[in-house]
Amino acid sequence: MIKTIKADLENKIQKTIKELALSSNIKLDKINIVMQKPPKSEMGDLSILIFEFSKILKLSIPVITQEIIKQIGNEYKTKSMGPYLNIKFNRKEYIQNTIKKVNKEKENYGANNSLQNKKTIIEFSSPNTNKPLHVGHLRNDIIGESLSRILKASGSKVTKINLINDRGTHICKSMLAYKKFGNNITPEIAQKKGDHLIGDFYVKYNEYASQNSEIAENEIQQLLYQWEQGDEKTVQLWTKLNKWAIDGIKETYNTTNITFDKIYLESEIFKIGREVVINGLKEGLCYKREDGAICINIPTETNNIDNQNFKQKVLLRANGTSIYLTQDLGNIVARKNEFDFDEMIYVVGSEQIHHFKTLFYVADKLGITNENNLIHLSYGMVNLPEGKMKSREGNIIDADNLIHDLSQSTMLELKKRYENEQNLQKLALNISLGAIHYYLLKTAIHKDILFNKTESLSFTGNSGPYIQYVGARINSILDKYNNLNLPNKNTNFDLLINENEWEIIKIISEFEEYIIKASKDRNPSIIANYSYLLAKNFSTYYQDTKIIDKDNLELTHARIDLAKAVLQTIKNCMHLLNIPYIQKM
């Protein structure tokens, strides 16, 4: 609704400014129209900045304002205030159109075509098979999943990809520890998920290496060499441990409702990059050093490609082995061939900024794709109160245990409320997932997070359980209304004159704009904070207003339609944020 009004006003203002420019013989390259919310609601619903037009057209603000008002006509109430023209909407029409639109479009409300047919790949999660997922992975996963849903809501054709890192020295560390200390233990014998069992051996390796560093390093290199040569026993061990780890990781994905369209294993595709570099050498895009290594020159600061100071970057070592950047080049080629993407987004922590700047520059120079088609969506770290997590020391909050801990805390609270209620375990899990997902999304993604379990589970603050609770409360209101079995009547939206009702309507009507902004900025926190704003406003309204009034059924019908629109919008937010909707709490 608000988007339609803004587009209508923009067209009328554009027409007015062009006519004024033409009459003054002024050539305009671009007309930038600034619309914003007034600081106070009584000033209007939208403010248009006129001052810039005055400078360009060399006309007074009142003259320009009057011409715009003529063009707008009687459709909106207008009032000039200094450099601004304030607009007031027709409330009755606006309320009716907004509620009808939401309740008609339902789960599609908010969807738009701002990214229509744009082919986007999002690579996220990308775990190593030497440990379970921890809360840092959860932030990566929920950003990737949520952003995928937001981009889809804006019309993009999204492909979600997961590249599982299942080879290399870090994987060999768990393998070596298992060979030394495993005693043929299995997840079944240990009564542990496979990824947790493998993670234990990763920690054991680091304990062993701290006492035998040189020996351990030599053993790791020997094990890696044996794997690369296809040694049967080594490959069998690698296959067994990787399967345990991947099966365990997939269980966590299933619990957290994280899905992928395609899962790659690094071991299956890492050689593609070598071919890309050799082809680049043949085409003269890179060069061979005296020792046989194949290199390319990159700017010393890859965020400034005009910098003329270059340094050498090895793409293939003298012995023919590749580096991670080379493997990533191969992945870009493979995905370009398979999906012909318009853009590829990598959801990876901020510590990898330099790697991706270099990767994108080299991909461009080798003619693989324009570096502007490649995006590193950098996110901040998730820290414990004690500091940064380190999996090699076992100092992590692993995802499964975090979910379990929060579920147990929630169960204790639920048992106080529902002594005889069934399925409390499922309810506790869904509340816990809402708590975790919301907490990891509500902060702007580039910022670090200090994870606070108690705060994440709060039912009263800016939290996932609060959003879930407001949704459940509205559902309860609707159930109570439906049980009255009142006759169906046309809703009289003219009765919704409460200022709180108007504020809620305006928030609902802006949902599409929030999705567009979240898509453009690639920032799910915009939707998270929007959902809290809507939930908080409805909660205030509910406390101050009698929604079901048996003595005024006409008003009740109108307020119930409003409540339905709020619930649908909250449910749509929850879907975008991968937060479970709960009917009863």
UniProtKB/Swiss-Prot annotation:
Q: Does the keyword ATP-binding apply?
A: yes
Question: Mainly localized where?
Answer: cytoplasm
> Per the record, what are the reactions this protein catalyses?
tRNA(Arg) + L-arginine + ATP = L-arginyl-tRNA(Arg) + AMP + diphosphate
Q: Which InterPro entries match?
A: aa-tRNA-synth_I_CS (IPR001412), Arg-tRNA-ligase (IPR001278), Arg-tRNA-synth_N (IPR005148), Arg-tRNA-synth_N_sf (IPR036695), ArgRS_core (IPR035684), DALR_anticod-bd (IPR008909), Rossmann-like_a/b/a_fold (IPR014729), tRNAsynth_Ia_anticodon-bd (IPR009080)
- Care to name a GO molecular-function term for this sequence? arginine-tRNA ligase activity
Please name the SMART domains in this protein's record. Arg_tRNA_synt_N, DALR_1
Which BP terms from GO are recorded? arginyl-tRNA aminoacylation
Ordered alphabetically, the record's keywords are:
Aminoacyl-tRNA synthetase, ATP-binding, Cytoplasm, Ligase, Nucleotide-binding, Protein biosynthesis
The EC number(s) attached to this protein equal 6.1.1.19
Localization: Cytoplasm
The record places the motif ('HIGH' region) at: 127-137
Q: Which GO terms describe its cellular component?
A: cytoplasm
Report the sequence similarity comment from the record. Belongs to the class-I aminoacyl-tRNA synthetase family.
Its subunit composition reads: Monomer.
Its protein name is: Arginine--tRNA ligase
Lineage of this protein's species?
Answer: Bacteria, Pseudomonadati, Spirochaetota, Spirochaetia, Spirochaetales
